Every structure is written in C-alpha cells, then in structure tokens.
Amino acid sequence: MIISHFYDWQKLPDSMTEDLMAEFNWHGAKYLTINGHQLAEHVDDASGYLRNFGAHMRAQHLETRDAHAPAGDSWDLNIVDPDQRRKIFKVHSMFLEMLADMGVHTYTMHVGTRDYMPPHCSELPPLRRLAEEMLELLLPVAEKNQIILAVENSFEAPNAPDEVVGLVERFKSPWLRCCFDAGHACRMADFEGRDLSLYRPGYIEESWHGHIILEKDAYAKMKPFTVTAHLHDNNGYSDQHKLAFDGCIDWHKLLSELRDTPSLFSIQNEMAHSKHHIPVGRACEAFAAIEDFFATGVLNTKTDHEHRFQTVISTLLKNGEN
C-alpha cells in the first residue's frame, strides 16, 4: 500500500525544500504527493520545476505516485468558458506527460462547482455534460501516459458521490476511477445529531440550490471504483483538513472499508500542515498507524513518544516491584 503525504511545498523557498523532505524521510515516509498549487503556480516553467522537485525527492530517498490537479474556478472539469476549457485541456495534458516521467500513477481531479453557484446558477445536466466532454478529451492522454484520472467527491451538488460515480460508470474506462475524500464525505454524512444550522450561512443555498443531499454511506457508493483516498479529519461541518484522528470521523470503520477495497492503490495524507502546524513527525506517526492497520487489522493510534513514555513507566514500576 502506498502511503503518500501532501505538503504546501509551493510556500517554501527552494533552498529549504530538501531540508523538509529530509524530515519526512527521517520519520519513515516514502512517498510525497504533487499538489495542485505547485502545478498551478508553475505552468510556465513546469518542466524545470518538476525536474528540480524530483531531484530533491531522489536526494532524500522519496518518490511520488500520486498528484492532485490544479482545482478551482479555472481548472475543473465542468467549467463553462470555452476559451478556458481549451486552455486547461492543453495544460492538464502537459502535466500528465510530465508527471508520468516522475512515476505518478493517479491524477486526482475535481468535477467543479463555480458555474453551479451564484451568480451563475447553472443546472446540473449541462454541467455534467461539460465534465463528460472534458474527460472524453483527457482520457486518451491519461491512457497514453498510463495515469488514472481519479475524480473526487466534495461537498457541493456537482461533486456529490452520485455525480462522481456516474461519470466513472458512463465511461467504463480503467483510466477513470474515483478518489474518495474522507473529510469531504464526513462533511456530508447523515450522522445522528446533524444540525444543518451549523453549516456556514448560505452554504446550502449556494452549493445545493437549497436542497442538500446527505449521505448515509458515501464510501459504499464509491468503493467499487476507488483507487486512492484523501484522508483528513474535521468537525463534520467545515473542510478543516485536520490530521486523521483529530476530528469526528469513525476511523476504525472507514479504514476497515478501505482495507477491504481490492482496487485501492494508495492513501494520501491531505492534512493542511501550514494551517494546523502539525509536526511532520506526528503526521507520519498517524499514517504509520494506518499502514500498520492495513497490515494487521489492529488500529493503535498512540504515537511513538507515548509508547516510549509508557515503556519507561512500566519499567520503573516493574523495578519498583522487584
């Protein structure tokens, strides 16, 4: 199982990149995810930037197998503007070719929500068709470069699990699959005690045209098609991107389902380091526990520090008894 880590590499000066990569390596990480902000900020010099970033990774004995496409108003599958659509097809194609040379196997993409929300307020059917048309163009490029396009669930109507799965089912291509985002699914989960008033004011009207659809089990819908998963946590109402185990997700239940997914290629730590200021070591410990769970079926989220502390205390108590 590939365990890969996001980081806001675009916020670091190049001179510090390898220093931080060394931290990931020291704490047992083997893979890093190329994030969409990195790509979006280096469209004009992507080849040189990615070549340099890859050299930094190799120097610290790290690799990449997963990338996230740039996302948002100018990048998503269903954007309406014809000129921008032509542009992003060319740029996504360029990225796929370059990322293939780095060993990337999955390229996560957002369906998109800009033109569904005010002031545009497009309806779902035409946006769905636009997403299909973009995928029709990109899938031959993905196949040529042996990279799977992984469409991701989010928390707006165009990105709901049914929409994401619908795209995959319509194409029936091995080069189009799902990226399951655990934090996004948690935000849309129909859990006991859900209080719609705790969402951001205006969220339901803007992102769902007033008719929100909560999910009893989003992963059950996406499981047959899932090749990668973005793991992060939250309070159930905001996309906080906390570290796994720091929010309200039932991780034992979710990880058990992921462990039982034959098509799963990788899981990715999408915690927002620069937002929550979580040390690299702590993030790596959390995902080492997840990796152990995949191997053993036993989930132990205590950190190495806690284990060492308990070992010292146990030894002292034992010596005291003697």
Regions found by a protein language model. Name each.
Residues 32, 135-248:
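Acidic/histidine-rich catalytic cores of soluble enzymes
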Residues 19, 56-59, 77-180, 187:
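Active-site acidic/histidine proton-transfer and metal-coordination neighborhood
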Residues 7-17, 35-50, 75-78, 114-120, ...:
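Acidic-and-aromatic substrate-binding clefts and catalytic sites of carbohydrate-active enzymes
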Residues 34, 64-69, 104-112, 149-151, ...:
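Short beta-strand segments at enzyme active-site cores
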Residues 231-232, 265-274:
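Short acidic/histidine-rich active-site segments
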Residues 1-104, 136, 173, 177, ...:
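N-terminal pre-domain/capping segments
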Residues 240-265, 282-284:
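C-terminal/domain-terminus segments
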